[in-house]
Amino acid sequence: LVYERSEEKMSKQIYLDNAATTQMSDAVKQAMEPYLQENYGNASTAYSIGEDARRELEKSREVIAATLHAKTSEIYFTSGGSESDNWAVKNIAAACKKKGRHIITTNIEHHAILNSCEYLEKLGYDVTYLEVDGDGLISPEQVMDAIRPDTTLISVMFANNEVGTIEPIYQIGKIAREKQILFHTDAVQAYAQIPLSVNYYPVDLLSASAHKFHGPKGV
C-alpha cells in the first residue's frame, strides 16, 4: 500500500497489491445485488425464488466453464482457493490410496497445499517436496525423477503468489498423463491473467478464486 501524505494525516490510499486481493468490480456488484436483496432464495429449493437463484448459479457456472473450455459439470464452487486446494489434494489422496500413497509437490506452494500435505503425512502418506532453482522454477525432469510406482497425485502451482514465477505446467501435465497420475494446479494467481484452457493444459484439477480478479470473496 502506498499513501500520499498530507499535513494532517495519510488521506489518500493507492492500492498496489492486486496479487493479494482485488476490489470487486461495479459490474459484479450490480449482477449480484438482486440476489443479495429480493432474489435471495436457496438455490437447492424447489419453489420459484430458489429456482431463480439456481438458474443464475448455473449461468455463472457456464460462464466460468467457457473461460476454461471446460464442461459445466466440471465446475465446482467452493468457499475460495484454499478450500479448493484442500478439496483437491485430500480427496484425490483418499480416492487413490489403494493405488498408492505418494504425492509430489513443490516447496513454494500456497499453505493450503503444504498444510494438506502435512496432514496427509500424519496419515501415513509420503510427500516429495521438489525444490526450485535460483529462478524459482522446477523442471519437468525433476518431476519425472520423483515419480514412483505408488505416486497418485502431482500438485504444482501455476503462478507463484510471492515471486510471480510461472511453472512449466504444460510439460508437467504431459508427464502426468503419460504416467497416468492425476495432476492438480493451483491457478489462483494465473486465472484471468494467463489464458487457460483445459483442452490445452493437461490438468485434472485446477483451483481459482474470484477475489483475485475483481469478483467476490468466498467463491
Task: Give short role names for the model-derived ranges.
Residues 2-219:
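Pyridoxal 5′-phosphate
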